[in-house]
Amino acid sequence: MTDSLLRRAQHSVAPLQRREIEAALALCALDAVSSVVPTMHLETAVRSGHLSAGLWAVRRRAGLGRELSGVVWNGANFTAILPATDEVMADSQRADVAAGAVSRLARPAAMVGPAEVTLDLWGRVEPWWGPAREFRPRQVSMAIADAPTHVGAVDAEDLGLEAVRRATLDDYDDLLPACVHMFIGEVGYDPMRHGRVAYEDRLRQLVRSGRAFLQYGTVEGRRAVVFKSEIGALGGGVAQLQGVWVHPSLRGRGLARAGLCAVIESTRTTIAPTVSLYVNDFNTPAIAAYEAVGFARVGEFATVMF
């Protein structure tokens, strides 16, 4: 970082301009799965006419001017899309982006994205943004762009399973506890104690937009949510799943695989042709379930939480 501050920067980090949206979308399209979050916000800007303050441009010196060479989303999470043609350019670009992030951006709740870029940037900004509360350097990025592979019948004769469907606001009080349980296990803190209003607003928005799925069944004699998942990001023809969850007392009975098949079919038919997700590399049961229904490994992600 010190070297990047002393030398003349070849790249700048500054708010994205409207005239750059088309070029930014083209950069993101080079890897639509990895770029789904920035793409979502760029597409929102196109539809709404409002350019989010979280969108930042990485510009490279080119003659007397500068040209767009990367895109950064800095909202609750930080994601950098930094295509590079060679190692020298990549190192220069990342050094300048790290310096720009430290000097111009607020520290996010997490850094998330393609592992190579995310880990490189984290190594450069750690003295300023650290320490990390949670470090997940190896996450498997997966995607499916075909019909899912249907698995065998679920061991669920006693569960009174209803069909997997999109949640409505009438389901909200049942869905919320499942989402909170998943969030605590995945992120490590209770969103109802820290940022409750924003968390609930976000969940309601997903429900209203038809991006939350659930399944009811019977648990200990009571009707309850037994499976759920949401589309956390949507852009560039990619729907990124988050929060794939099965009721703890029912795990190992095939509900995740059957539920995922239904979610994939519905999503690919009505929302986006490609469905993606990422998962910790040590979560072998989840990876096995995803591969069983047809997800393929397409890359590696990394997450740094603060």
Question: Would you name each region that the model predicts?
Answer:
Residues A9, P15-L16, A26-A32, M40-A110, ...:
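Conserved donor-binding loop and adjoining core beta-sheet/short helix segment
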Residues G63-L64, V72-N77, V187-G188, H194-Q242, ...:
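Acetyl-CoA-dependent GNAT
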Residues M89-G100, Q242-P248, G252-T269, I287-A292:
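Conserved acetyl-CoA-binding loop-helix of GNAT-fold acetyltransferases
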